[in-house]
């Protein structure tokens, strides 16, 4: 029986003679539809199309192979039914010639067949990515050297503006970033020149009509709408009476003011700016709490009004931080720098192109650009037109089919346009994809290409037509309902770039039979009542704030150090064990399509999806392992950190250059040579100044025969003989052959195979061999260049990922990134790490790039040393932020839609109560069943978004109860959700129980040695386990210590001594008294957002950077802090915790006045001076024998808060923000005396004279405390 297609699928399969866009929702069977369309085109009708007359473009090589295989299978099955069909036989014969390919592969084919048209050597090859990166670095180095030699002033200003503080590396990175960005477009050089010319602006009037100005206006209107909505809500509450009427005096005119701002914006940016500068918010009328009926209503009204005020003030103070005249002047000022930068980029591009031609290599960017060069011509007026080659393709291809169209970029779109009849008679482009799954912005994918057609194509007969596939054949109804609820509530044109409405919603298409005796595995037929399927979507939240029934004193040191990743992994471990072995004795079942029945869940049915696996996956693997859960993480990282790869790379380093102590010690310590730590120490003691290699040569030459053992000399000779042999062979052997020779000659390949996880380790070594083989095909040769090649690979690609040895049917839980899961499906999906904040680091860069809006840069005045964002950068930054968050929304959609039967979500929050309050606040200020896009934009993580959405759900009581939310619910939704929060203490308890069990298991199996017959082996094992290092007393002495750590160590020592004295003096009756435990801070009062230590750090930062000319008045200090926030030196939240009154008190104190007097008289004032010095190790460890350790030094590092010069010497000052009780100043001084004395000693050495006075200044006490001389 054939596949039963839906009406929409039938249309997508059979519609012809038009450009057709198929918007295929997740799980809608788009690949099956695409294959069926191709099969019908090549086998049915009066004139079936030969398959080589179709161009099928897929996103990956794997997808192309799968497509070809599916088509081949379909033709073969048809031939079984009709063996005599000549049409089928012909299509099967033509299949290998068919253009079912990625865009890069198609471009390569075009170039190979037309190389003569672009003057390309036919012997070209595709350059290795790392090889190309090395060439780029060489070209950049030469380019910069040439520019420095020219002594060009504009170039020097460019380096000064963008090069970085210590080198020009940052400018290097900017050039590479620009180059990679512009190469994703069809006309890179012209794009660059056009966008640079936008800086050549002369008047305010020229701003109007700029694309980035329109985007800025869109961003502003979003803010104004939010402000207006908040004010109208505040008005509605106040108008209800209850004593809030006085607020209306302010609110009414402020609503009118925001409306006038909206009108002014519609009339142009200049009118809006003038109106904004005149906008003001008066002091809110005072309303006493005692006089109102509802205190919550008062707080909500006040909060809504204050939030709207902040929005308008942010527009005025941050977006328009300069006047429009200054904005125009700033852009004009940057024009020469941008022109110089674009010239550098174009010169780099030309040199790179020439170098590749010289080496006969192409990179992936070249494939698309050279293909386009072949496909286009220009007419007499310079307009683009198809070349003869392109016209031939237009005639050849009956249809061009593009899979995953939402991930196309602009240059690929241009190529498709050149080889198809999209814009001429007989249109023939078939595009299929889902814009909600466009998640490759980092590869310059442009979802707007899909959206433009999605909006303009029609759903009925037309030359440009669209068809919607909305039925999901993957997931259960429980999953579909959950997906629809979340994204109807959150996804919009603003965040997601598409309104998720009924038209976009998933419809149930999958048929999961009812669980009964007929469709369950035999062994479970008698347990039907005891079987479980599907269930609610689960949200599990880790509350990092902890459990209020536990104090910090009850947590051990290990527990204190546990981070949220480990704890979240434990939640997931518990959830997996609940699925695999429910405590109630039931069985969780999943439907197996191959069996056509329900079966018990297996580990391989479960996937853990993470936004990014780095720093997460390894921790998850370790933690889940303690639960006995088999798990595999496809991280794509960790390869270069494996012991086997590090060992071989260390060997290669010393073969290339043995004068590298770290690599030589690594090699000697490895199983290949088995040197011991004591032998290293003996070698080093022979000569402290020479390289180890030199010492080893001298040992072999017999210079130290009286000082070392024969065994050590024998080991050294063995090492040297092998090293000399390898160095000789490395000089003439190809690197890949040499590496395999090393594996064999050292027997290391066989050795790692006997280690735990040996198959994986050997596979990793084979990967290195294959990488060496790839290197041999590049233009670089020799061991030295191979090492550089590997080092560059580490930096540019991050890692190669461990070799994959896991089969698809291995029964393990898989951990993968959401990106890698795209196109896959799993019975159970656990979406982890949802509390991780969105990564917006790219938005902080000096230069932002946008395909449509151009270049966003700071205005930098090199001479005056000032820098601020241009208006254009504000616009581009806002647009990029919207695109980043829209992509995050789509990534979340991809994650949700991977689940077939069960979805479990986990995430962590710092403070559950505060998070729930924020979610409820966002929901309460949003109308209808949606969350206001402005509130969605405020979300910092997936968990924030999910939490906001669920406050409106009928199952969201748990969130609303904690967050005190008064919210209109969406009572019509069919999805079901369950919630559970986990406290830190609860998870620690679970782990301690596991540890106790493991310790018992180890204890019970600890008698194995006594059963061994080989006594020598037993003795050797015991000797190794009982080994004691001869300098054991020095092991606790660090090589490097900070002043703070040293101070703490002394305080602990004093505390311990005091404790012993107290214990000695206490009576036995006293000891029997119950110990009084300190009440945790979170039980006394709600935890502050910033710890005391963090606040202290912020205060120190302000004291370091504040302008000493502006510390007299509170307003001056407040303005200085605001500047630090604007420059992103402090976050807005950090700026709010700065106590400007305390800072003013310091500068008004006698000590502060002395500092200012020194500053104003031109004497030296230093702030935050870092230092490194050496002190005797005996200061740290007093029990060290001075005869042995007398000359041992420890490096001491610290930062001196401030010191200043007076007529008769220097004054040292250290700020403290600690809590201090009145009358306990002496104890406070003693606490820090050792620290201050160390600072004094250091300064005495630096200055060459004695520091005359030293002070502590307590911000808490608002007084200076003099440190007496010892």
Curated annotation (Swiss-Prot):
Keywords: ATP-binding, DNA damage, DNA repair, DNA-binding, Exonuclease, Helicase, Hydrolase, Isomerase, Nuclease, Nucleotide-binding. Its EC number is 3.1.-.-, 5.6.2.4. GO terms for cellular component: cytosol; DNA helicase complex. InterPro entries: AddA, DNA_helicase_UvrD-like_C, DNA_helicase_UvrD/REP, P-loop_NTPase, PDDEXK-like_dom_sf, PDDEXK_AddAB-type, Restrct_endonuc-II-like, UvrD-like_ATP-bd. PROSITE patterns: UVRD_HELICASE_ATP_BIND, UVRD_HELICASE_CTER. Residues 528-823 form the UvrD-like helicase C-terminal domain. It catalyses: Couples ATP hydrolysis with the unwinding of duplex DNA by translocating in the 3'-5' direction; ATP + H2O = ADP + phosphate + H(+). Pfam families: PDDEXK_1 (PF12705), UvrD-helicase (PF00580), UvrD_C (PF13361). GO terms for molecular function: 3'-5' DNA helicase activity; 3'-5' exonuclease activity; ATP binding; ATP hydrolysis activity; double-stranded DNA binding. One of its GO terms (biological process) is double-strand break repair via homologous recombination. ATP binds at residues 24-31. Its cofactor is Mg(2+). Residues 3-476 form the UvrD-like helicase ATP-binding domain. The heterodimer acts as both an ATP-dependent DNA helicase and an ATP-dependent, dual-direction single-stranded exonuclease. Recognizes the chi site generating a DNA molecule suitable for the initiation of homologous recombination. The AddA nuclease domain is required for chi fragment generation; this subunit has the helicase and 3' -> 5' nuclease activities. Heterodimer of AddA and AddB/RexB. Belongs to the helicase family. AddA subfamily. NCBIfam families: addA_Gpos. HAMAP family: AddA (MF_01451). This is ATP-dependent helicase/nuclease subunit A. The gene is addA.
């Amino acid at each position: 029986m054939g596949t039963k297609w839906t009406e929409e699928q039938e249309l997508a399969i059979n519609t012809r003679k038009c450009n057709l866009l198929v918007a295929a929702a997740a799980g809608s069977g788009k690949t099956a539809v695409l294959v069926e369309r191709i099969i019908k085109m090549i086998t049915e009708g009066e004139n079936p199309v030969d398959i080589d007359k179709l161009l099928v473009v897929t996103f990956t090589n794997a997808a192309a192979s799968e497509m070809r295989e599916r088509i081949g299978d379909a033709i073969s099955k048809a031939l079984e039914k009709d063996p005599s069909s000549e049409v089928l036989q012909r299509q099967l014969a033509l299949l290998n010639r068919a253009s079912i390919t990625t865009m890069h592969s198609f471009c390569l084919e075009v170039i190979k067949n037309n190389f003569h048209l672009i003057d390309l050597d036919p012997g070209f090859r595709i350059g290795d990515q790392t090889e190309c990166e090395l060439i780029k670095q060489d070209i950049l180095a030469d380019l910069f050297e040439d520019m420095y030699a020219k002594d060009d002033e504009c170039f020097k200003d460019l380096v000064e503006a963008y090069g970085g503080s210590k080198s020009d590396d940052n400018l290097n990175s900017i050039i590479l970033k620009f180059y990679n960005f512009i190469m994703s477009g069809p006309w890179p050089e012209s794009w660059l020149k056009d966008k640079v010319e936008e800086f050549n602006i002369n008047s305010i009037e020229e701003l109007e009509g700029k694309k980035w100005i329109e985007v800025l206006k869109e961003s502003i209107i979003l803010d104004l709408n939010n402000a207006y909505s908040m004010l109208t809500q505040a008005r509605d509450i106040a108008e209800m009476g209850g004593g809030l009427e006085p607020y209306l005096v302010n609110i009414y005119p402020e609503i009118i003011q925001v409306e006038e701002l909206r009108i002014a914006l519609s009339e142009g940016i200049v009118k809006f700016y003038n109106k904004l500068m005149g906008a003001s918010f008066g002091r809110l009328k005072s309303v006493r709490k005692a006089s109102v009926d509802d205190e919550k209503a008062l707080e909500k009204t006040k909060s809504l009004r204050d939030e709207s005020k902040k929005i308008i003030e942010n527009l005025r103070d941050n977006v328009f931080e300069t006047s429009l005249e200054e904005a125009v002047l700033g852009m004009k000022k940057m024009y020469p720098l941008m022109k110089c930068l674009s010239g550098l980029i174009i010169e780099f591009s030309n040199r790179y192109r020439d170098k590749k031609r010289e080496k006969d290599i192409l990179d992936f960017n070249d494939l698309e650009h050279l293909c386009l060069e072949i496909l286009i011509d220009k007419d007499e007026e310079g307009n683009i037109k198809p070349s003869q080659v392109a016209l031939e393709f237009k005639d050849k291809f009956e249809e061009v089919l593009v899979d995953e169209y939402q991930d196309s970029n602009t240059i690929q779109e241009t190529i498709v346009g050149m080889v198809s009849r999209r814009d001429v008679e007989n249109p023939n482009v078939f595009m299929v994809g889902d814009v909600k799954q466009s998640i490759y912005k980092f590869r310059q994918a442009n979802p707007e290409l899909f959206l433009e057609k999605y909006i303009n194509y029609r759903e009925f007969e037309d030359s440009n037509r669209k068809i919607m596939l909305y039925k999901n054949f993957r997931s259960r109804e429980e999953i579909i309902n959950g997906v629809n609820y979340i994204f109807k509530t959150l996804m919009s044109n603003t965040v997601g770039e598409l309104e998720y409405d009924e038209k976009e919603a998933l419809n149930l298409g999958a048929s999961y039979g009812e669980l009964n005796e007929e469709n369950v595995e035999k062994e479970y037929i008698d347990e039907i009542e005891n079987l479980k399927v599907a269930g609610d979507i689960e949200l599990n939240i880790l509350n990092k704030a902890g459990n209020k029934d536990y104090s910090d004193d009850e947590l051990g040191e290990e527990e204190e150090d546990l981070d949220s990743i480990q704890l979240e992994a434990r939640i997931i471990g518990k959830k997996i064990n609940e699925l695999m072995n429910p405590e109630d004795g039931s069985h969780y079942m999943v439907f197996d399509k191959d069996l056509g029945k329900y079966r018990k869940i297996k580990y391989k049915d479960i996937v853990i999806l993470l936004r990014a696996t780095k720093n997460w996956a390894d921790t998850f693997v370790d933690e889940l392992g303690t639960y006995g859960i088999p798990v595999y993480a496809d991280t794509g990282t960790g390869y270069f950190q494996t012991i086997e790869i590090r060992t071989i790379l260390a060997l290669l380093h010393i073969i290339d250059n043995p004068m590298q102590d770290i690599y030589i010690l690594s090699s000697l310590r490895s199983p290949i040579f088995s040197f011991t730590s004591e032998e290293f120490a003996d070698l080093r003691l022979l000569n402290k100044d020479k390289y180890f290699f030199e010492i080893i040569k001298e040992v072999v030459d017999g210079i130290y025969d009286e000082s070392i053992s024969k065994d050590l000399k024998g080991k050294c000779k063995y090492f040297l003989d092998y090293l000399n042999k390898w160095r000789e062979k490395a000089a003439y052997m190809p690197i890949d052959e040499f590496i395999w020779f090393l594996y064999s000659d050292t027997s290391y390949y066989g050795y790692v195979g006997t280690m735990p996880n040996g198959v994986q380790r050997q596979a990793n070594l084979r990967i290195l061999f294959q990488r060496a083989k790839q290197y041999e095909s590049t233009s670089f040769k020799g061991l030295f260049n191979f090492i550089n090649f590997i080092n560059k690979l580490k930096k540019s690609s991050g890692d190669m990922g461990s070799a994959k040895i896991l089969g698809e049917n291995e029964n393990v839980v898989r951990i993968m990134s959401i990106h890698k899961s795209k196109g896959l499906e799993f019975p159970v999906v656990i979406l982890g790490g949802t509390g991780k904040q969105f990564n917006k680091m790219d938005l902080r860069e000096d230069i932002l790039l946008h395909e449509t809006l151009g270049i966003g840069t700071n205005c930098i005045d090199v001479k005056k040393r000032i820098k601020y964002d241009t208006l254009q950068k504000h616009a581009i930054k806002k647009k990029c932020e919207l695109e980043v968050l829209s992509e995050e929304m789509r990534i979340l959609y991809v994650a949700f839609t991977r689940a077939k039967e069960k979805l479990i979500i986990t995430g962590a929050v710092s403070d559950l109560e505060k998070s729930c309050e924020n979610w409820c606040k966002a929901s309460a200020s949003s109308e209808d069943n949606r969350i206001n896009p402005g509130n969605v934009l405020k979300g910092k993580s997936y968990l924030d978004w999910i939490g906001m959405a669920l406050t409106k759900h009928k199952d969201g009581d748990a969130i609303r109860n904690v967050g005190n939310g008064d919210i209109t619910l969406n009572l019509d939704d069919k999805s079901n959700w369950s919630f559970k929060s986990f406290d830190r203490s609860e998870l620690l308890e679970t782990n301690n129980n596991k540890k106790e069990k493991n310790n018992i298991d180890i204890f019970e199996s600890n008698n194995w040695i006594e059963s061994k017959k080989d006594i020598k082996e037993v003795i050797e094992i015991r000797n190794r386990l009982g080994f004691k290092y001869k300098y054991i007393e020095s092991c606790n002495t660090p090589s490097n210590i900070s002043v703070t750590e040293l101070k703490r160590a002394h305080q602990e020592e004093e505390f311990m001594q005091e404790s012993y004295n107290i214990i000695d003096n206490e009576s036995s009756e006293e000891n029997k008294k119950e110990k009084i435990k300190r009440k945790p801070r979170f039980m006394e009062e709600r935890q502050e957002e910033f710890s005391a230590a963090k606040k202290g750090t912020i205060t120190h930062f302000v004291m370091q950077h504040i302008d000493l000319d502006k510390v007299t008045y509170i307003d001056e200090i407040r303005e200085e802090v605001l500047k630090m926030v604007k420059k992103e030196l402090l976050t807005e939240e950090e700026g709010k915790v700065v106590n400007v009154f305390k800072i003013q008190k310091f500068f008004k104190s006698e000590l502060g006045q002395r500092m200012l007097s020194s500053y104003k008289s031109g004497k030296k004032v230093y702030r935050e001076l870092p230092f490194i010095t050496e002190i005797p190790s005996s200061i740290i460890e007093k029990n060290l024998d001075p005869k042995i350790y007398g000359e041992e030094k420890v490096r001491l590092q610290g930062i001196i808060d401030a010191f200043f010069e007076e007529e008769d010497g220097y004054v040292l000052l250290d700020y403290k923000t600690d809590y201090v009780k009145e009358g306990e100043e002496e104890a406070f001084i003693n606490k820090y005396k050792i620290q201050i004395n160390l600072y004094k000693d250091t300064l005495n050495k630096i200055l060459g004279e004695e520091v005359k006075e030293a002070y502590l200044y307590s911000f808490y006490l608002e007084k200076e405390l003099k440190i007496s001389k010892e």
